[in-house]
Amino acid sequence: MKTKSIEWWNSLKKNDDTDVTAIEGDTVVYISGIAFLIQRKNDFNNVVCWKVKTTKKDLVSIFSTFRAFCQKNDIQYLRIEGHGKHHYKMLNLLYKYSPEGAGLAYAVEESKEYKSNIWYVKTY
């Protein structure tokens, strides 16, 4: 696991769903081919994930490492927003493999453009 600069994140070629600009105060973590941008503005822990390179490492162990990083840095909730299969895969990974006592906090729907589910997942 490595902490990367926001400039590194901003230099990555990403698709439309993950083309988010990192700003001062955000945190970028790189674990086994996957980059995590933790947006910290207004104390929200919105996380954007991007697969930088194909990895043979198990996705569950990558998320376990990421959760350990969250616990060490006192990030208690992650905000997951989106729609479609990738959104639900990430939600299910965080929920299914979360430590005992953690899990789904709550969910709301809001968006004029499309149905967008916003979930807050407790990390520990």
Residue ranges and their predicted role:
Residues 72-75:
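Short, high-confidence coil segments that cap the C-terminus of an alpha-helix
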Residues 17-44:
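A conserved beta-strand-loop-helix scaffold within acyl/acetyltransferase catalytic domains
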Residues 55-68:
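Conserved acetyl-CoA-binding loop-helix of GNAT-fold acetyltransferases
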Residues 98-118:
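Conserved catalytic-core motifs of GNAT/GCN5-like acyltransferases
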Residues 41-54:
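Conserved acetyl-CoA binding element of GNAT-fold acetyltransferases
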Residues 1-19:
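Short amphipathic alpha-helix that is part of the acyltransferase structural core
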Residues 88-100:
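Short, aromatic/basic amphipathic alpha-helical patches
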Residues 79-91:
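Conserved beta-strand-loop-alpha-helix junction that forms the acyl-donor binding cleft
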